[in-house]
Amino acid sequence: MNPHDNPLKAVGPHYDAAQMLIAREHTRAAVEAIAAAMQPGMAESEAIETAKDILADMGLLRGWHDVYVRFGSNTVQIGGAPADPHRVLGEDDIFLVDIGPCWQHWEGDGGDTFVTGSNREMARCAEDVKAIFHEVRRHWLSTGATGRQLYEFAKASTERRGWELNFDLPGHRISDFPHKAIVNVPLSGIEFRPSQELWVLEIHIRDKDRRFGAFFEDMLLDDSYFER
């Protein structure tokens, strides 16, 4: 059942790397579909219901964590943290999407940040979070860094750009459902090189005055999966 000696690399009976990648493709498509449905004037509570409808239409409503959509100042909060559900998306605003759908036996996990207008700082934040993600991911590829070392690197990369890294989103395992029954430790806490397809790198950055933030997450994978 567990092909690895290290219990933190354990998988369940339905684990299949190829199917995990298909779950990832469905998840990334769902994030984009949800983002496309967000309109200025929409309340955050309405946005979450819209996101759930989209996931249901895609056969992805069952998830291993709740559906999160955050607008404006609520983007400084992690999923599950208290936030104003009546926050309305503005014409010149920032928002993030964070979903963890299950496709059949396999878990997906994806998040991204988008802007609705031309606010340069918000746009830079949304762009920088992706740049930091890929900088950390390439560091993982080139150095064999441990999970803990990746988040030390992420902190430096974030601060160099003038943002604050939120360590309350420290990365995690992913597997056949439910991974939390198999392994439930943060990526930032492991002292070995995380394996491709088994770990999700989460990057959540915030404006130092906590006015807004940005989020991006995806599987740890090599460059070929991001060149399409």
Give the role of each language-model region.
Residues 1-228:
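Active-site neighborhoods and metal-handling regions in enzymes and metal-associated proteins
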